[in-house]
Swiss-Prot record:
Protein name: Cytotoxin 2
Major location (coarse): secreted
GO cellular component: extracellular region; membrane; other organism cell membrane
GO terms, biological process: killing of cells of another organism
Quaternary state and interactors: Monomer in solution; Homodimer and oligomer in the presence of negatively charged lipids forming a pore with a size ranging between 20 and 30 Angstroms.
Further comment: Shows very weak hemolytic activity.
Keyword Secreted: yes
Keyword presence, GTP-binding: no
């Protein structure tokens, strides 16, 4: 699996066991990602932070 890093078009290949790409952003500024990369389990959203997770190459 290949996931974008914080600034596309940079990306990296995920290590074994991290089978999701994710994008984390603040609820107040949804168009500005705070963090991107590979993750094993999609974190829960909170009142301030949202996570978008997906399992195809460079989908974040």
């Amino acid at each position: 699996l290949k996931c974008h890093q914080l600034i596309p078009p940079f990306w990296k290949t995920c290590p074994e066991g991290k089978n999701l790409c994710y994008k984390m952003y603040m609820v107040a500024t949804p168009m500005i990602p705070v963090k991107r990369g590979c993750i094993d389990v999609c974190p829960k959203n909170s009142a301030l932070v949202k996570y978008m997770c997906c399992n195809t190459d460079k989908c974040n």
